[in-house]
Regions:
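Transmembrane alpha-helices and adjacent helix-loop boundaries
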Residues: 2-482
Length: 482
């Protein structure tokens, strides 16, 4: 890697890289990364009938190099920010007035990040389909790429849901996977038992769209059930109770076989496009829209479903944060005693945080069930709660954009280990590289807690201001007038 964005000269003044220097640094980083990854990742060797053959994977190497360059750019924008560096450096001239500077690169790009990510998310499946049907450089990337994007969006939605409880309200929840499970089993049971029993088999094509709001409602009710016993708890005690709640739900799903089928699990029917199935029949999606049948059409449909659900989660959370309930969550997070002294009902504030966060988890769970087409209690162990919490913590508590970047990095690293099959020849026999994904997540958390304890996006601004912020000279501040 090249030198950081700022370097100290002999006179002690910091040098800020220009845009051209940053671009040169990114090009240099990409070239070095590509050269390193070419012999390691791009060339895959395999024993085939006693002979050693090699399979080129230059697309994967270039993609990983692009991820490294993107991460480097994020560090330039978010970590090596000149304003953040200046705030940490001691001021040698105490009497020098504080002069308002122009907006930093992060401030200028901040409002544009969300719309840019949304446009990229809409175009992403078509990009994967295009490269999947290209000249063979990326075989199978249409299915794999869209499936990876679905996983990332699913965990982004889960992260935003948990962010309501942990990031905004400051309530440490280690049992969030319980609401995820409630949503998944709600859809599975509604689609396989109750909806056909109540309305007949003709309701099955619409079971998913009917079950999503029901799953959100039932999960929110369970969130309130969890919220009542922990109203007076905080910190470690709250974490232990929520952890126990998640384990209770897992044990119920595992042992209440007459209702949940236990370890055998439940098969789940596929979703349809408002009653139009994705199959080869004359009434299928491809026939009605005069398209050639391809299974990728169903996965593209699932991608846009989870994109819409995630977008709803983002917009609702953003709107609630600006309402009185959102400001009450932030007040509760900062100081519960001061929150009570201001007349805020902490009971309803906590319960609404648990209920709304659980509702988003239930919606994500119902989508998980229809995507997997099979669910069992093994999908809802504590490790899932830890994984979601890691995404929230690494992204930055209270930061929605930070959770997006964190989910992409963590899920991307997890999937990358599936591709590092060359490690099988280095590691002991029988060792799967994918088993080291949690080791990488743990190492990332240790490094983040050491160097950026507030996450990828650390900027926490108040939701509302009483007055516009003004520049104040240092001499007034030293006299206590600022």
């Amino acid at each position: 890697m090249s030198a950081p964005i700022k370097s100290s000269s002999g006179g002690g003044e910091a040098k800020v890289l220009s845009s051209a220097e940053i671009a040169r640094d990114l090009v240099f980083t990409g070239i070095i990364t590509a050269l390193i990854l070419t012999p390691i990742v791009a060339i895959r060797t395999q024993l085939d009938q006693g002979s050693l053959t090699w399979h080129p994977r230059f697309g994967l190497a270039l993609s990983l190099a692009g991820i490294v360059v993107a991460a480097r750019l994020l560090f330039h924008v978010l970590v090596w920010n000149p304003r953040a560096k200046a705030a940490l450096e001691p001021d040698t001239e105490a009497s020098r007035p504080v002069v308002a500077k122009g907006p930093s690169l992060a401030d200028r790009l901040g409002p544009k990040v969300g719309p840019i990510l949304l446009v990229l998310a809409i175009l992403l499946p078509f990009f994967f389909i295009a490269i999947g049907h290209s000249s063979g450089l990326f075989p199978g990337w249409d299915r794999r790429g869209i499936d990876f994007a679905i996983t990332v969006l699913l965990y982004i939605m889960l992260g935003w849901g948990l962010n309501v409880v942990v990031g905004l309200a400051g309530l440490l929840d280690l049992g969030y996977v319980a609401f995820y499970a409630v949503g998944a089993y709600t859809y599975a049971l509604m689609a396989t038992r109750y909806l056909p029993q109540w309305f007949g088999p003709g309701i099955l094509p619409y079971a998913f769209f009917i079950s999503v709001p029901i799953a959100a409602f039932l999960a929110s009710m369970w969130g309130m059930v969890l919220g009542f016993p922990v109203l007076r708890l905080k910190g470690d005690y709250l974490a232990i109770v929520t952890l126990a709640f998640g384990e209770i739900i897992y044990q119920v799903l595992q042992n209440f076989s007459r209702f949940t089928e236990g370890p055998r699990g439940i098969g789940v029917p596929k979703a349809t496009f408002f009653g139009i199935p994705f199959d080869k029949s004359d009434s299928g999606f491809a026939s009605l829209f005069h398209l050639e049948y391809n299974r990728i059409q169903y996965f593209t449909f699932l991608y846009f479903v989870i994109l819409i659900l995630a977008l709803v989660t983002f917009l609702v959370t953003r709107k609630l944060r600006r309402l009185p309930i959102g400001r009450a969550w932030e007040a509760l997070r900062e100081d519960e005693i001061a929150c009570r002294s201001l007349g805020i009902n902490t009971t309803t504030t906590k319960l609404t945080a648990f209920a709304i966060g659980a509702a988003f988890g239930g919606m994500a769970g119902s989508f998980f069930a229809v995507r997997q087409e099979f669910i069992s209690p093994e999908s809802f162990k504590y490790i899932e709660s830890a994984f979601i919490l890691a995404i929230v913590v690494l992204g930055g508590l209270g930061s929605q954009i930070g959770i997006v970047f964190s989910a992409m990095v963590i899920i991307g690293a997890t999937e990358m280990f599936r591709e590092l099959e060359f490690l099988k020849y280095v590691l002991p026999e029988g060792t799967e590289p994918v088993q080291f994904r949690m080791l990488a997540v743990g190492l990332a958390m240790v490094l983040m807690m050491r160097f950026r304890p507030r996450g990828f996006v650390t900027k926490r601004e108040p939701t509302v201001y009483l007055k516009e912020k003004k520049s104040v000279s240092a001499d007034l501040v030293s006299q206590g007038h600022g």
